[in-house]
């Protein structure tokens, strides 16, 4: 099980996977953000889910919603994690 707030170096790839969650407008979102090590930009392999009840996560597939969430998560988490990786 991958815990929230994890940074995982993907083997044989120049990427990290960051897992975390955030509450936006009362909805809990979970992410698995795959980030290129060199450019520090999230890749298309990133996945987002929203929690609709205590036991159910739904994948987010709408491109506009994905772009919105990438922006939130990048602004909120990416710099923090990249600083942690560099230390």
What are these regions (language model features)?
Residues 54-85:
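Acidic, low-complexity intrinsically disordered segments
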Residues 1-8:
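Short coil-to-beta transition motif at edge beta-strands of beta-rich domains
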Residues 14:
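Short beta-strand or tight-loop elements
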Residues 3, 19-60:
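Basic, polyanion-binding surface patches
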């Amino acid at each position: 099980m991958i815990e929230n707030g994890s940074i995982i170096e993907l083997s044989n790839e120049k990427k990290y996977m960051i897992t975390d969650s955030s509450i936006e407008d009362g909805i809990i979102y979970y992410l698995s953000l795959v980030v290129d090590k060199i450019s520090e930009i999230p890749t298309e392999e990133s996945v987002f889910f929203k929690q609709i009840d205590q036991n159910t996560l739904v994948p987010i597939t709408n491109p506009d919603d994905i772009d919105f969430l990438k922006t939130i998560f990048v602004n909120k988490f990416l710099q923090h994690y990249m600083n942690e990786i560099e230390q």
